[in-house]
From Swiss-Prot:
The keyword Hydrolase applies. Signal peptide: none annotated. It holds the Pfam family dUTPase. GO terms for molecular function: dUTP diphosphatase activity; magnesium ion binding. Pathway: Pyrimidine metabolism; dUMP biosynthesis; dUMP from dCTP (dUTP route): step 2/2. This is Deoxyuridine 5'-triphosphate nucleotidohydrolase. Its cofactor is Mg(2+). One of its GO terms (biological process) is dUTP catabolic process. The keyword Calcium does not apply. It catalyses: dUTP + H2O = dUMP + diphosphate + H(+). Belongs to the dUTPase family. This enzyme is involved in nucleotide metabolism: it produces dUMP, the immediate precursor of thymidine nucleotides and it decreases the intracellular concentration of dUTP so that uracil cannot be incorporated into DNA.
Length: 151
């Protein structure tokens, strides 16, 4: 298991609110919690930025983290990430913030300490571009959106 540096910015994290952990041995994501002083009402169509009370420094350019929605919040309540996916670069050292968007029809209340998103670590390959005049032909070529039809 890879070690990643985190800093607790809110003393409730690790006490009132658990540190992010993997729920099972096969879990890919760590739950992030809303580090709030009081409940936040998220009206339909509204977005807001929620603190997690944690700062992170991955420190390894071959890794990044992505913040993803929790499936139950989106499916049952229409609450998803405001930016759809959050990307945490390896050299970022600030607080993890989660943008949430209520795309549902009903107000949704986010309680202090509630699990609001999940964080997954992913490998990164930094590419260097090789300028060419033409590409070697492939079977697909320039076929884009919908080029293979409905199967």
């Amino acid at each position: 298991m890879k070690k990643i540096d985190i800093k607790i910015l809110d003393p409730r994290v690790g006490n009132e609110f658990p540190l992010p952990t993997y729920a099972t041995e096969g879990s890919a994501g760590l739950d992030l919690r809303a580090c709030l002083s009081e409940a936040v009402d998220l009206l339909p169509g509204q977005t807001t930025l929620l603190p997690t009370g944690l700062a992170i420094h991955i420190g390894d350019s071959s890794l990044a983290a992505v913040i993803l929605p929790r499936s139950g919040l989106g499916h049952k309540h229409g609450v998803v990430l405001g930016n759809l996916v959050g990307l945490i670069d390896s050299d970022y050292q600030g607080q993890l913030m989660v943008s949430v968007w209520n795309r549902g029809q009903q107000p949704f209340t986010i309680e202090p300490g509630e699990r609001i998103a999940q964080m997954v670590f992913v490998p990164v390959i930094q590419a260097e571009f090789n300028l060419v005049e033409d590409f070697d032909l492939s079977e697909r070529g320039t076929g884009g959106f919908g080029h293979s039809g409905r199967q």
